[in-house]
UniProtKB/Swiss-Prot annotation:
Primary role: Component of the dark-operative protochlorophyllide reductase (DPOR) that uses Mg-ATP and reduced ferredoxin to reduce ring D of protochlorophyllide (Pchlide) to form chlorophyllide a (Chlide). This reaction is light-independent. The L component serves as a unique electron donor to the NB-component of the complex, and binds Mg-ATP.
Pathway where this protein functions: Porphyrin-containing compound metabolism; chlorophyll biosynthesis (light-independent)
Residues binding [4Fe-4S] cluster, per UniProt: 124, 158
EC number of the protein: 1.3.7.7
GO BP annotations listed: light-independent chlorophyll biosynthetic process; photosynthesis, dark reaction
The family this protein is said to belong to: Belongs to the NifH/BchL/ChlL family.
Gene name of the record: chlL
Residues annotated for Mg(2+) binding in this entry: 43
Free-text remark on how the cofactor is bound: Binds 1 [4Fe-4S] cluster per dimer.
Subunit-level organization: Homodimer. Protochlorophyllide reductase is composed of three subunits; ChlL, ChlN and ChlB.
Origin organism lineage: Bacteria, Bacillati, Cyanobacteriota, Cyanophyceae, Synechococcales
Protein name, UniProt field: Light-independent protochlorophyllide reductase iron-sulfur ATP-binding protein
Organism annotation: Prochlorococcus marinus (strain MIT 9313)
Reported cofactor(s): [4Fe-4S] cluster
GO molecular function terms attached to this record: 4 iron, 4 sulfur cluster binding; ATP binding; metal ion binding; oxidoreductase activity, acting on iron-sulfur proteins as donors; oxidoreductase activity, acting on the CH-CH group of donors, iron-sulfur protein as acceptor
Amino acid sequence: MTTTLTRPADGEGSVQVQQDASVRIQEGALVIAVYGKGGIGKSTTSSNLSAAFSKLGKRVLQIGCDPKHDSTFTLTHRMVPTVIDILEEVDFHSEELRPDDFMFEGFNGVKCVESGGPPAGTGCGGYVTGQTVKLLKEHHLLEDTDVVIFDVLGDVVCGGFAAPLQHANYCLIVTANDFDSIFAMNRIVAAINAKAKNYKVRLGGVIANRSAELDQIEKFNQQTGLKTMAHFKNVDAIRRSRLKKCTIFEMDSSDEGVMECQNEYLSLAQKMLDNVEPLEAEPLKDREIFDLLGFD
């Protein structure tokens, strides 16, 4: 059961969505939450990273945490029903469901779940995420999983959409080499630090996406203590893979940039499996970001 509690350790006067402590992802699984500015390419990044983990022989589960429910369509090649939609069909009697009602197999055996969300302007996305994890646990679907990836809505860092951080070992932040993306990343760093006071989640690093250069990202990293873990340039093959509803690993490896992207995703996956050193980063004040990046 999800309740709302005041947690001063998360920030003075903060109110956070607190999940049932008994609903936990099994110990031993690598759990990653992927955040970043809206439209930055988190779903593409998450799906390709899931595919990379599967290529390394891992059993992977990707959970989409966005009401748009488009996180996993490049893995499944279609838009799958959401957990919240399926639960509504059975009047929220989860015992009536079978695993294949809400979990779908995607590329190379990756398991895919879309949590969905409440109607616009109502409810809490964090509650839906909590119900999704609870449902997976009830059906013993987390017991044979090596890697779990939460693909989280935009850069919303309220108590609800910060809920995946309560399950994660690491948070990866997707950004571009521009002011708006970095500004959003700074807010996400603050949210992760707040959650880290009460949960095991730690910063894993930065994924630079659709960026030819890294100068602004690296300038920010140096000031905050972040580190770039992977760099994906503005490769047209990634755009085309979305149009074809497939991962970069299903594209022709002879096409320009495809092999380079595949290797970068495999390298990132291996770094995470090797227990990357958590980062101790400190966010900047808004004014400091403007001074650092805004007036060159």
